[in-house]
């Protein structure tokens, strides 16, 4: 009798556990197909299904990333600035505790957004603010570079002329010909007393920076961090930092699709040339990128000891720009939402450039709807791949794209690596996010 009672209690506890796990799955925010698959596994694979869900169905690492990143988010860095855009000395940052202040409100945001109301820009700007905490900014100058040699000549020139600080972040950083040239400049600047901090992605730069190279940086007092180093933790493989930025004296920004490697200049051994897009920007946007860099630095166990601008950068320039930073450590998929919004707002034309094209079902359907509604949709992807699998996967979408009237082109003059979207010749995106 006692054994029957014990068995009965075990059965009841197991049923309770199943109900708890099923409710957890239902409220997890996963897509419907994933939810149904896990519920079937839990119901029809006793015990094993629950163990599998706890081990594989819950993204524990992303939860930790979100908690860590929230403490040092770009928005919290920006929130330490003045409550208006008037020139005013920035308070000194000492610890993470100083991040806990009221959100920054820029007085000129409403005026700026009035300028872009005619093509739905206000809604796009608000979307980026609510999902990423960034603001529309005015900028005095920008230059685009489509040739790696010109882009890195500009970067090298600004590094040579740096007076206070150099902050660089790259998915791929190589200790090759270009990497050595950059290193020599950084070593000289370190001797001049500049604050220099570097972030390399733990996977993208894995095995690409020699020990001798790293030791020379350390010997010069140059700080560097690997973002989520994968050397000992394979579970981090999918959580990458794909950003590419150079910030000089908190006044000049270089960003775009180019990593730091010689092939971005000459195409390397595999390609005759490399087609990419990079930019040099001066203006208020630089402060936002600085906040992103600081956030990534703090999340990589870096100490908060930065040389920050003594005055909040204010520009009367005509170039309106806003940063969208997204990743596994953000609550909202800001970039995915931005792309969806841009596609649905289009009235005449959508132009997309990306080396890889593997859209999710939602964005694919929005592109098809746009084309079927008479909007011109043109997509350029790499014609010569550097990675075979995404190239082959992209081909599986061609029939659906072409049948809905979307034009698809393959770039043949080298490797296409730029990531751009232009909508109605009014709004464009340029950066480091592939369309996959």
Give the residues covered by each predicted segment.
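Helical hairpin unit composed of two closely spaced alpha helices linked by a short loop
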Residues: 356-377, 382, 387
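Thr-Gly-centered strand-to-loop micro-motif
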Residues: 352-354, 411, 430-431
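Long hydrophobic segments that form regular secondary structure
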Residues: 335-352, 369-372, 376
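Aromatic (often tryptophan-rich) hydrophobic motifs at membrane interfaces
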Residues: 348, 366, 376-380, 407-410, ...
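Short, well-ordered secondary-structure micro-motifs
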Residues: 363, 390-392, 421, 433
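Short, contiguous acidic/charged loop-to-helix segments that flank catalytic cores in large enzymes
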Residues: 330, 356-358, 384-392, 408-411, ...
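N-terminal localization/anchoring segments of enzymes in phospholipid and broader phosphate metabolism
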Residues: 1-336, 341, 345, 385, ...
């Amino acid at each position: 009798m006692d054994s029957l009672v014990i068995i009965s209690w075990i059965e009841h506890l197991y049923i309770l556990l199943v109900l708890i796990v099923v409710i957890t799955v239902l409220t997890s925010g996963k897509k419907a197909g994933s939810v149904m698959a896990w519920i079937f596994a839990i119901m029809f694979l006793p015990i094993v299904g629950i163990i599998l869900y706890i081990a594989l169905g819950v993204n524990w690492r992303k939860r930790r990333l979100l908690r860590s990143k929230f403490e040092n988010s770009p928005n919290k860095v920006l929130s330490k600035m003045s409550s208006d855009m008037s020139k005013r000395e920035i308070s000194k940052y000492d610890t993470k505790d100083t991040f806990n202040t009221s959100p920054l409100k820029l007085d000129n945001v409403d005026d700026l957004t009035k300028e872009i109301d005619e093509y739905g820009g206000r809604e796009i700007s608000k979307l980026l603010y609510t999902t990423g905490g960034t603001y529309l900014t005015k900028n005095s100058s920008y230059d685009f570079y489509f040739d790696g040699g010109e882009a890195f000549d500009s970067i090298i020139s600004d590094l040579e002329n740096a007076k206070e600080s150099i902050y660089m972040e790259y998915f791929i950083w190589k200790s090759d010909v270009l990497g050595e040239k950059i290193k020599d400049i950084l070593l000289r600047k370190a001797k001049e007393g500049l604050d220099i901090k570097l972030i390399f992605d733990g996977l993208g730069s894995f095995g690409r920076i020699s020990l001798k190279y790293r030791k020379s940086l350390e010997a010069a007092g140059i700080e560097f961090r690997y973002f989520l180093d994968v050397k000992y933790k394979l579970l981090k493989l999918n959580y990458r930092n794909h950003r590419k930025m150079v910030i000089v004296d908190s006044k000049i920004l270089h960003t775009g699709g180019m990593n730091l490697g010689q092939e971005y200049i000459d195409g390397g051994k595999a390609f005759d040339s490399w087609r990419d897009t990079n930019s040099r920007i001066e203006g208020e946007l630089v402060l936002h990128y600085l906040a992103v860099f600081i956030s990534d630095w703090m999340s990589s166990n870096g100490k908060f000891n930065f040389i920050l601008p003594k005055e909040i950068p204010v520009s009367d320039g005509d170039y309106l720009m806003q940063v969208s930073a997204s990743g596994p450590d953000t609550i909202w998929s800001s970039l995915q939402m931005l792309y969806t919004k841009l596609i649905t707002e289009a009235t005449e034309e959508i132009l997309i450039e990306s080396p890889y094209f593997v859209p999710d079902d939602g964005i694919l359907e929005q592109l098809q709807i746009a084309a079927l509604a008479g909007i011109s949709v043109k997509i350029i992807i790499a014609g010569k791949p550097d990675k075979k699998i995404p190239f082959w996967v992209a081909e599986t979408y061609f029939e659906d794209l072409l049948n809905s009237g979307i034009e698809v082109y393959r770039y043949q003059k080298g490797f296409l690596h730029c990531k751009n979207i232009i909508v109605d010749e009014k709004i464009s995106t340029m950066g480091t996010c592939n369309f996959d």
